[in-house]
Amino acid sequence: MNNLLTGNVPARHTRRRLPSRPFLKWAGGKRRSLATLLQRLPSPDEVECLVEPFVGGASVFLGTDYRQYLLADINADLIDVYLHVRDDPAGMIKRLERLFLQGNNETAYRENRDEFNRIQAGPEKSALFIYLNQHCFNGICRYNKQGIFNVPFGRRKAAYIPETEIMAFARKTERCHVSFFHAEFEDTLKMTTAGMFAGLSCAVYCDPPYLPVSQTAGFTAYSGDVFTVSDHERLAGQLAALHARKGMPVVISASDTLISHRIYGEAGFRLYGHDVVRSVSASAASRKTAGELTGVLMRGQGDKS
């Protein structure tokens, strides 16, 4: 595969504390890849703000110390959860205690899933989202084309209320300035040069839904819409244009596939390969090490392999 670099470089970030665990399970979450990403992301001394158009489980937010963050996702339910946890973490925990008390069985799960799909956005729906995340099969977040959450019950022996993680997330939002947006990636990238973010030095980190390594390896739909090869091409092109126009550092994560190499390599990304253990998969028995790419667009970056 062309344009692939390997090797480690010293981390650009000095951690004052161990990063908190995310309170949500998330397919492709970056907790296990954080050390690798910190080698590539600019440090908080180099940029003021980190922009994430695909915030997902928020592992990178929790594992870095920028002064400002623009965190966005196309999944409106996910963004609502983060807003409600930020604004009232204690109230969220109380709601979860009630849901979890008698909730670890398939009958209760189906009732709560139906309720989640029926009610409007609000604190109760966000609590149900966390409940479903902790009780569904492998923590998968999946919707059908009608926007209905349809993941089956996971049959776990015990479900865990992520109280410590929720409180840690809320405390992190108090230590920095965080803006949450429900937005597609195009609109999020436009925000980096407008309004309150226009005068800031920003870096962009993108963790889009991965292209599967095979036809049966997995899905790339977490909001009811599939993230296609064409979407990856548009993303790569827009990131390259933003970097060329504004000099903004850009880091992306992608699956280590031929098509990922083509898309991001042709857009000018320097590609670094590493292995990561997948913690969420369609089959619990098939969890294994997989190849992952980190792509970088950064001015003045030499070959650090």
Question: Language-model features: where?
Answer:
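SAM-dependent nucleic-acid methyltransferase catalytic core
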Residues: 2-23, 28-33, 39-46, 89-206, ...
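Conserved S-adenosyl-L-methionine
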Residues: 40, 46-101
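Short His-Asn-centered micro-motif
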Residues: 53, 72, 181-184, 206-208, ...
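Short, polar loop motifs at secondary-structure junctions
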Residues: 54-59, 165-167, 255-258
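Short, surface-exposed loop/helix-turn segments at secondary-structure junctions
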Residues: 218-226
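Conserved Class I SAM-dependent methyltransferase catalytic core
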Residues: 232-277
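Class I S-adenosyl-L-methionine
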Residues: 269-305
